[in-house]
From Swiss-Prot:
Biological processes, Gene Ontology terms: translation
GO cellular component, one term: large ribosomal subunit
Keywords (A to Z) from UniProt: Ribonucleoprotein, Ribosomal protein
Keyword Aminoacyl-tRNA synthetase listed: no
Stated name of the protein: Large ribosomal subunit protein bL32
UniProt xrefs under PANTHER family: 50S RIBOSOMAL PROTEIN L32, LARGE RIBOSOMAL SUBUNIT PROTEIN BL32
Family: Belongs to the bacterial ribosomal protein bL32 family.
Signal peptide residue numbers: none
Region (Disordered): 1-28
Pfam families in alphabetical order: Ribosomal_L32p
Biased composition range(s): Basic and acidic residues: 11-22
A single GO molecular function term of this UniProt record: structural constituent of ribosome
The keyword DNA-binding is assigned to this record: no
Gene designation: rpmF
Length: 60
């Protein structure tokens, strides 16, 4: 197992961890149905940018 040669300061440790924070997912509201979905993804009803792109009945 690796052993550090010198102790890392709190500042160095925290600066390394500064990029570890999680960001909330960006959500969009579908303009025709009003549903919320991830950006650049099809809504649960199969609508993307106002157009029906997936026939929901065919999947089931």
């Amino acid at each position: 197992m690796a052993v550090q040669q010198n102790k890392k300061s709190r500042s160095a440790r925290d600066m390394r961890r500064s990029h570890d924070a999680l960001e909330a997912s960006t959500l969009s509201v579908e303009k025709t149905t009003g549903e919320i979905h991830l950006r650049h993804h099809v809504s649960p009803e199969g609508v993307y940018r106002g157009r029906k792109v997936i026939d929901k009945g065919a999947d089931e």
